[in-house]
């Protein structure tokens, strides 16, 4: 099984790239994608999309997160009251369930700024472990916290543009990115890069910006043990013009019998 994880930067051209490589992946976790129901090949089996709303008072949808599969049957997950943040932060996360393994797939695009207080007041977050030394609450705290509760006891794979890199902690950011990894590992997630690259690998290629790895993929230990390859697919950003300012991550898993 091959999984592609990609922030498409809202580019229509990115869909040309994705459709052209459809035979090379089984599941794609997409972020900053236009409505995939309008862009995907209509023959594809599964399209799960969670849009972000436009500005307050506007019915316009900007973009969203998606889980798609050309031939694998997936069922979109609709959060209930037990997972208020997965519902409240829709568009930052799309979740799908499979009858195979991994059982769960989730595509995340977490914000690069704290959750506003007006939003925090909507639901309890008291049980979520926080990463930032200054006590601010981030989507990176809330969404994986609820995902791990949802996934409990089942296999899973989640990832996307997390707007987080360990290297940020060394450059005057608010901090807490390394602590995030500790929290996620304690909750049962393993970074799928770990067996292939000891250091973070650049996935963000916007001109005049630091070369961070903002995109990451995690899974439960059993799924992690099936990983055959993890790599950054640089041709998507090497094209002129580039298909996106993020390069996809491709993860290859040994298929289950």
Segment roles from a protein language model:
Residues 15, 37-41, 45-47, 117, ...:
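Short glycine-/acidic-enriched loop or helix-start segments at secondary-structure transitions
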Residues 2-8, 18-39, 105, 141-170, ...:
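Active-site beta-strand/loop signature of hydrolases that rely on acidic residues for catalysis
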Residues 79-84, 153-157, 164-257:
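Metal-dependent phosphoester-hydrolase catalytic domains
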